[in-house]
């Protein structure tokens, strides 16, 4: 049975999932997934030395509800001219625990997501999103004359904990599952003072329980799911045919710019009233037939697609780095061989 709220259909609420999370086979699989590419981590090697012992320890934490999110390590990463604050949890027990949770709840989250959202979803991603945008632009030219591009200001830092927890409660009725989701969501507030002031109007109480950590595995799915009601509102209430979302990066196509400007006003209201988000001031409304759509690292035109300049530059930098690294390794091997021969 489905529940209809705000013009959008919601699937039935699911229960009896928590015991699947702490099932030993699920924990073993979580460890296998979490350790991919991290075999050199001391924590991974520690668990591999006696997996039954350590995974039983995690299982007991989950059964007895003594699990608490560990302290985050914070570091900064520069990407495309932006400095991002990254939050990192210990491999054990936290990252294994988050994998165990997501292996169980991921299918239910994906069921509620529309087909035109592409971030943090298996078998979708950038190329699937690009293909959908390209198909719209090239096969329905009259209804794709104009594009609205928006994204949320400081998105991860602006996610409201209470709203996110209520969204999970619309889907799950398992109190034990909701307990551990709440525990992870409330483990840290990542919003800066300027984010809080920007989000909340003067006549509202500022909620300090805001912001989820970039770098948390659960944050990717929570960040995607936070938008799900909005996605359904766009499709089922506003009946927007060409709406595409990659996390908080949104592209909407329409016949006229007037339609898009009106829609932008309504989106602004929805963001503030229902999600406590703010649209970045650099939103764009433009004709697609003149400049193409800059999205997901590409520029999409009616008759062709180009790589974005910055994407090309990034690829060149990586190629130079790997080439120089490979040359250094060859040189070291050559010197080693010469020393051995001599």
Regions found by a protein language model. Name each.
Residues 3, 38-45, 70-96, 112-124, ...:
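Short, conserved non-catalytic motifs in the polymerase core
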Residues 3-4, 13-17, 102-160:
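Active-site-proximal segment of RNA-dependent polymerases
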Residues 61-62, 136-247, 251-266, 287:
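Conserved polymerase palm-domain catalytic core
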Residues 268-277:
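A common structural junction motif
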Residues 1-56:
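Non-catalytic, polymerase-adjacent accessory regions of viral genome-replication enzymes
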Residues 2, 99, 201-209, 261, ...:
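Right-hand nucleic-acid polymerase module
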Residues 47-71:
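Amphipathic alpha-helical blocks
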């Amino acid at each position: 049975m489905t529940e209809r709220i705000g013009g959008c259909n919601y699937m039935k609420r699911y229960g009896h999932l928590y015991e699947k999370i702490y099932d030993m086979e699920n924990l073993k699989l979580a460890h296998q997934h979490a350790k991919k590419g991290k075999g050199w981590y001391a924590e991974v090697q520690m668990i591999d030395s006696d997996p039954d012992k350590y995974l039983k320890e995690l299982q007991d934490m989950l059964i007895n509800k003594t699990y608490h999110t560990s302290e985050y390590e914070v570091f900064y990463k520069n990407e495309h001219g932006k400095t991002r604050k990254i939050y990192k949890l210990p491999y054990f027990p936290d990252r294994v625990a988050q994998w165990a949770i997501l292996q169980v709840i991921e299918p239910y989250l994906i069921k509620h997501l529309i087909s035109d959202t592409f971030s943090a979803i298996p078998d979708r991603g950038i190329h699937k999103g690009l293909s959908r945008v390209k198909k719209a632009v090239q096969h329905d030219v009259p209804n794709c004359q104009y594009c609205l591009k928006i994204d949320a200001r400081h998105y991860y830092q602006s996610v409201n904990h209470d709203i996110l927890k209520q969204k999970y409660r619309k889907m799950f009725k398992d109190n034990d599952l909701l307990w551990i989701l709440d525990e992870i969501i409330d483990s840290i507030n990542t919003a800066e003072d300027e984010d809080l002031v920007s989000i909340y109007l003067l006549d509202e109480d500022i909620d300090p329980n805001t912001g989820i950590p970039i770098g948390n595995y659960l944050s990717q799915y929570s960040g995607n799911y936070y938008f799900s009601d909005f996605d359904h509102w766009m499709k089922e209430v506003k009946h927007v045919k060409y709406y595409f979302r990659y996390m908080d990066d949104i592209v909407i196509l329409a016949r006229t710019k007037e339609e898009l400007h009106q829609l932008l006003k309504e989106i602004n209201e929805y963001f503030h009233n229902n999600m406590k988000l703010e649209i970045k001031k650099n939103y764009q409304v433009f004709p697609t037939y003149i400049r193409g759509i800059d999205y997901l690292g590409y520029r999409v035109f009616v008759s062709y697609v180009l790589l974005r300049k910055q994407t090309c530059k990034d690829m060149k930098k990586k190629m130079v780095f790997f080439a120089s690294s490979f040359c250094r390794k060859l040189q070291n091997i050559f010197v080693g061989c010469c020393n051995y021969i001599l």
